[in-house]
Amino acid sequence: MKVKVKHLQRFFSSDASGGIVLIIAAALAMVMANTSVTSGLYHSFLETPVQLRVGALEINKNMLLWINDALMAVFFLLIGLEVKRELIQGSLASRRQAVFPVIAALGGMIVPALVYLAFNAQDPVAREGWAIPAATDIAFALGVLALLGSRVPTALKIFLMALAIIDDLGAIVIIALFYTHDLSMLSLGVAAAAIAVLMALNLSGVRRTGIYILVGAVLWTAVLKSGVHATLAGVIVGFMIPLEEKHGKSPAKALEHVLHPWVAFMILPLFAFANAGVSLQGVTLAGLTSLLPLGIMAGLFIGKPLGISLFCWLALKLKWASLPEGTTCKQIMAVGILCGIGFTMSIFIATLAFGSVDPALINWAKLGILIGSVLSAVVGYLILRQRVTDTRLAV
């Protein structure tokens, strides 16, 4: 018994364990969603209504939306804390290093959209899905990266985090501008006021994390009610919590330490389980001949790494930015392939683009997203494994 416990402790303490659990959860979801015996149970779980009421405020969501909007806000809170630490004390501390993932993210959004339009520009309906391959699923991309464990340079992981956050922010802006028609200006005003309070707390030197979380809950609720993706609130709160150490304690680092195991072994696996169960009913290989899925596949698998690599090369050539310390151009290119994992964010944009037009288009889009994302995950992992191994051997 002691030996089994020791093996479990060793597994959960390894850097790769979170990625393994996430992949298992995603595989289980795919099997359950596409098996007649379990598909009903799977979808019933996701559609379970959950109600939260505080005074006159009432939020009614199903389990899927609570996982995606609430639990994933905690994940983005952790990402915000980690990126802030690296911007101030770590691999993104210099201006040229900090601007590098910003430029990479721009390339990773612009080029995939252009590749998609190269296939679908002539079709006015399909053209509406131009933003589908511009998105990156940060949770799955980091999950695949985690499979490589401690072999991955910290700076490379932070680069992917920063790039994916900017990519996600870009996707949120795109959704708000092009796919959302009922934004609540009142809720956005409340959100702006909550951000102002968070900034005031930070500038006043308030170090009690609980106060930031409380105001953050108000911010999350306001963003949710506004029609904008609520996970944005997590990133903002993460950037507002003080990092500076006093008496040997840093509020941001302490919270980061507490959140890590919960995010790795509960929140991300739940997210994977809730979102990876893509039903393949109605999806046929004949659909692969359609320009819609071909454009998405090409955008994710070719456009993403091409855009990121091209913009990074230009930034380095023009001396606008510099590589994160301890990384190589080949590793950056491999990370660019991983960013082709569009998955949940791409599916979300596809439902917004085609949901009111034709359900068949959503099925075709899902086919392109699934194949493009799987190709990006497998090829990106294999190439990156070789690149980090080569670097370690050279040292």
Curated annotation (Swiss-Prot):
Biological process per Gene Ontology, one example term: regulation of pH
Catalytic activity: Na(+)(in) + 2 H(+)(out) = Na(+)(out) + 2 H(+)(in)
Record key words, sorted: Antiport, Cell inner membrane, Cell membrane, Ion transport, Membrane, Sodium, Sodium transport, Transmembrane, Transmembrane helix, Transport
Membrane-spanning segments: 11-31, 63-83, 99-119, 129-149, 158-178, 183-203, 223-243, 258-278, 282-302, 332-352, 364-384
Compartments, as annotated in UniProt: Cell inner membrane
Protein's organism: Klebsiella pneumoniae subsp. pneumoniae (strain ATCC 700721 / MGH 78578)
Domain of life: Bacteria
Family: Belongs to the NhaA Na(+)/H(+) (TC 2.A.33) antiporter family.
One Gene Ontology MF term: sodium:proton antiporter activity
Gene3D superfamilies, sorted: Na+/H+ antiporter like domain
InterPro entries: Na/H_antiporter_dom_sf, NhaA
Known function: Na(+)/H(+) antiporter that extrudes sodium in exchange for external protons.
Main location (coarse class): membrane
Protein name: Na(+)/H(+) antiporter NhaA 1
Topology relative to the membrane: Multi-pass membrane protein
PANTHER family per the UniProt record, alphabetical: NA(+)_H(+) ANTIPORTER NHAA, SODIUM ION/PROTON ANTIPORTER NHAA-RELATED
A cellular-component GO term for this protein: plasma membrane
